[in-house]
Amino acid sequence: MGSFAGACEIVEEKDDEVRLPKHSGRYGKSVMGSSSKDLVERKQREYHGSLEYDIDMLFQSISVKPSTTRLMSSSFHHHETSASAGPSRTTSPSKRIASMKKPGTPQSPRFVGLSDSVSLKQALRDRCISKASEMAAQKRLSKSAAASPRVSEADRIKSLYNQVSNESTSSRSGLVPVDKGKGSLVEIPLMPVNDKPSSSKSVPQRFEDPSNPISEPSQAGTSFGLQGVGNQTREIKLLHRSNKPGSCLSSGSGDYEIELDENVASPSTHAFVEDDVIEIDKHVTSLPSHSSKKVNATELDKNISSSAVDSEQKGKLDDAPNSGTENGKTVRKVTRMIPRPKQPKKKILLKKKLKIGVVSATYPTKDDEEIVPSLDSSANQLLCQRCHCSLKSTSIDDNPPSYTSSHNPKICTDSLSSVSNKEAHQGSDENSSGSCNVSQSSEADIVIMKQDVSSSNNSGIGAMVEKETENPTSSEKFEFSLSSKDSLGDYSRSTSISEESNLSRFSCGNKPHMSMDVRWEAIKHIKVQYGSLGLRHFNLLKKLGCGDIGTVYLAELIGTNCLFAIKVMDNEFLARRKKSPRAQAEREILKMLDHPFLPTLYAQFTSDNLSCLVMEYCPGGDLHVLRQKQLGRCFPEPAARFYVAEILLALEYLHMLGIIYRDLKPENILVREDGHIMLTDFDLSLRCAVNPTLVRSNSPPGKDPARISGPYNTSNCIQPFCITEPSCQVSCFSPRLSSNQQQGRKPKRGDHLSKTQQHLSRSLPQLVAEPTEARSNSFVGTHEYLAPEIIKGEGHGAAVDWWTFGVLLYELLYGKTPFKGYNNDETLANVVLQNLKFPDSPLVSFQAKDLIRGLLVKEPENRLGSEKGSVEIKRHPFFEGLNWALIRCAIPPELPDFYEYGGGPEAAADSPGGSNNRYLECKAIGDHLEFELF
């Protein structure tokens, strides 16, 4: 039967049986007829029911809409009710005959069937001839505008689907009515033929039109050939099993149901009108040849990425019969030719994009589904999802084997295979269309993946990771990525640090806040060059100080200008005095530290029974020496606040790690070259457990703790509301505005906050990481800085650091410690018994005195910071206006003087005695460098 308006009939014939006589038609078409009247009558009796059923299905599934020229009728009558009625004509006989006389007009093949159905087939043939004549005339009229762009493919596909009208179907045929918005179902019946000879056969016709050359019939088992596919978008469509009734495609012993969506029309769906033939490429799904199951083709994604198509790369359509063998029977398949009305020509604006979409669909449950076996690799036939026509497999195995499965597609028991042709590069052969990818998904999900490649080389593809389907039962992920060398700058969703970079980062103990320090590279270079680092790689320039367990030297790394502070400890001396545990504790603590106000341990090694710790060098000396240089031997209050604020952050970090410092004094606070401080000496520190918690502020509502303290407050003002964070937060150490300045300035948006909002901002949760449960009975520290609980021997915890913090602030402001006596015994007695007193000079603000009073409370449980640690202290009015997050951006009160050894070997060579005197002897260079330990 000839094809018309969106359908084709596929019938079977038995080879080597009855050979029907053939004769040529008017236009060179082969027409087959019955050999005798007896044969026709016998075939009528044997196949009367089957033929009527197929014709009934054909006329019910296909209804051609009337065209703009009213050349086609709107419907057909049922065969059972009006089998002998003549076909309805929409054109007069004269017009129809005139159209048939036009040169080059193709006509449908004549076929001789049963006597009862001659009138219906004749009507079908006449309609095909009329339609073909109309399209040929329109084709000649459109040649004048050949220079204009082609009609948009979206409009062509849409017009193709619009030709199928809405018509109710009977339950016997199982056809689904057409819905323009949701898709249409097109049925292609395949008639199985038994061993008896067949009298109803259809032969494809050949149109000899020079403008549309048709290739010779293929013997490879397919009827459509696609050529010249390049720079086009491919899709992955996953098919799902279903047993729901619908339009089915009979294939041997099984039915396959394919649902089409008319919204699929897009520039990526290539269909070309050339001499009444529609060329359709790419969107193909492998069709099993030996299967008795049903398959649903899910609706395609509406937003399909488009790609450019060059005119010289357009493929030609083969209109050749396809002979295949199914279940021991020979099947002859006839391809259809769809005439198309003239469409207005438009420009096609194409964009290349990469899109991954995951959509879900509702399908029958597992109880209703049937398992589809694997496909036979020998029968690899492709079926177009839009026109239901067999296509030639154009996949070329020119890709790596790991991504190629074009010739052996397989279907697992829990999912169906989907065929995807990868994009060909611009510079590759136009006949190469990539390889086929087979992916899997769960039964209730559909994954549509579109990929477009516009790069001319293999390194421009990039990494692509497919989203995991939302079905909880699915545990498979599809991930496509390239090497990091091919996709520099691309980050996948499962990014991880490489082992090489990870080892290079932590092999030398690199710290984030010191990651840009050139001293790391210098140390690493020596380790790589010599295999290990030792004392022989350093030149000792100067003795910086002596402590209880070791001596600190200024050293220079040989071959560089990098200066380090090396703490050298004699292992035999430590073992003899039972101080090895203290040295070991300091090494472990230094390894843990990573803070801008704490030392950085660059390396540690043992050389000649000497344990060495290589740390950063602070050329500014310590706060004790720096205080001696100040006028009145005390710091101004702003400078003191700068230093104690950074010390407070260092103590907060230590307490968060479960480290109680216990030896806070000006001698252990060094000044870096940038003016900021560094806390050092951890041999007396105590390690304990800590449990960080979040707490809320308990300040009374409606009160501003920043304004509570003043000249009229008494000394007994250490209340919870005094330690609340101030409402206004400005930059580090910015000058306060007087009342006159505040009255003269313009109000800002933040000034209009309600009291409730201000209270909520002050009552935000605070992190408390104070080791409140830590207890120790050791008598450690310096006499003047010892806490009362240490002297009494009652056991102590983290509160001893806040006592020493108060003593340090007192000394920085007044130039002396608050409880110093004539000797150590009197000093200890004053710490326990004497009340805190403030000298009359220098003048110190009330906020500073109030903070000192809160810190120097003799009962540790009532001491400021004993409950919540640094959170309580940071909220004190003494630190009002301090931005703790940007404290490193604040300008230091004083920068250290230029150090003569900072110039490296050149500066040392200019020193008296030349380079031979660079190495100094270990002798005391001042009392202020000695570590006074109890």
From Swiss-Prot:
Expressed in roots, cauline leaves, flowers and siliques. Residues 82-94, 212-227, 395-421, 755-764 have a biased composition (Polar residues). SMART domains: S_TKc. Residues 20-40, 70-113, 189-227, 305-343, 395-438, 466-493, 738-773 are annotated as: Disordered. Keywords: ATP-binding, Cytoplasm, Kinase, Nucleotide-binding, Nucleus, Serine/threonine-protein kinase, Transferase. Autophosphorylated. It catalyses: L-seryl-[protein] + ATP = O-phospho-L-seryl-[protein] + ADP + H(+); L-threonyl-[protein] + ATP = O-phospho-L-threonyl-[protein] + ADP + H(+). Coiled coil: none annotated. It is found in: Cytoplasm; Nucleus. The active site is at D663 (proton acceptor). GO terms for cellular component: cytoplasm; nucleus. ATP binds at L544, G545, C546, G547, D548, I549, G550, T551, V552, K567. Its EC number is 2.7.11.1. One of its GO terms (molecular function) is protein serine kinase activity. Residues 538-879 form the Protein kinase domain. Belongs to the protein kinase superfamily. Ser/Thr protein kinase family. Interacts with KCBP. Interacts with PERK8, PERK9, PERK10 and PERK13. Could be involved in the negative regulation of root growth. This is Serine/threonine-protein kinase KIPK1. The gene is KIPK1.
